[in-house]
Every structure is written in structure tokens, then in C-alpha cells.
């Protein structure tokens, strides 16, 4: 009597270290949603909250629109610039609460917690998308192989 080969137990629980392609697609889509949430926060910010309309806000909204496209298409080779830009925005947000920055983010340093909280609906509401884009951007940079479009760009 021949012994039957024992089947290996299947690991049904997906590993966090290697996300499935479907999980990566959902992560990329969530990055798109948060990038567009950042754009919406700036576009619909109340005009009275920021005393000056600057080119920086325009640059920021356009850039996050482009960042949404990068993550939507899974262009892994371009994941690092959005991470750096988001980190820069976070730093400038907190620095602008203490120091008057020359390029239109704030005319004067903010004093007190209430003024900092009311600094700008757009800038304040952007904090959550920035944190998400920064943290998950680093995760995707390490775990996401990118889409098939990357192979096309390599040719």
C-alpha cells in the first residue's frame, strides 16, 4: 500500500509582509482618495481663514492632483517625490505656526492654540491626508512593485 503524500497546510491568512495585488490596488486607491481630499480641502477652504491667496496654495493643489494620478496608475518610480513633498508640507505647516513665512502661507506667526487651530480650514484639514499620504507612501514605496505600466516605461 502506497502512502498518500501529505498536503502542506495552506496559509489562509494573508501575510502583512507581502500584501496581495488586490490589497495593493486598494491601498493605491486610498492614496488617490486622500490626495484628492487634500485638493478639496484647499479648494473649499473658507477665504476668511487665509488672509492671502498665494501661488503656493495653487502649486499645492495642482501637485496633489498629480500625486493622485501617480498612485492611481501605480507608477512606483515616482513614489518618492510625493513622499518628500508631503513631508515638506507638514514641516512648513508647523513652522508657519511659529514664524512668518515669506511666500504667502502666513503673514505673521500664529499665537495661541485657538488661532493655530483656526489657522486655515484648508491647511488644517490637510493634516490628516498629509499624515496618511506620508505613512502609507513609505509603506507602498517598500511593498508595492508598481503596475505593469512601469515595465512599459522601462522599455
Segments from the language model and where they lie:
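Membrane-interface extramembranous regions
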Residues: 2-155
Amino acid at each position: 500500500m502506497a502512502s498518500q503524500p501529505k498536503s502542506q497546510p495552506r496559509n489562509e491568512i494573508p501575510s502583512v509582509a507581502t500584501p496581495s495585488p488586490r490589497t495593493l490596488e486598494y491601498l493605491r486607491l486610498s492614496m488617490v482618495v486622500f490626495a484628492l481630499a487634500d485638493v478639496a480641502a484647499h479648494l473649499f477652504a473658507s477665504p476668511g481663514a487665509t488672509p492671502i491667496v498665494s501661488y503656493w496654495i495653487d502649486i499645492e493643489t495642482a501637485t496633489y492632483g498629480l500625486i493622485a494620478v501617480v498612485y492611481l496608475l501605480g507608477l512606483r518610480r515616482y513614489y518618492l517625490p510625493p513622499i518628500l513633498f508631503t513631508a515638506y508640507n507638514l514641516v512648513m505647516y508647523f513652522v508657519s505656526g511659529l514664524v512668518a513665512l515669506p511666500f504667502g502661507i502666513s503673514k505673521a506667526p500664529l499665537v495661541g492654540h485657538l488661532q493655530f487651530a483656526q489657522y486655515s480650514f484648508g491647511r488644517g484639514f490637510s493634516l490628516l491626508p498629509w499624515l496618511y499620504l506620508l505613512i502609507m507612501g513609505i509603506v507602498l514605496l517598500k511593498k508595492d512593485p508598481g503596475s505593469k505600466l512601469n515595465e512599459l516605461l522601462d522599455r
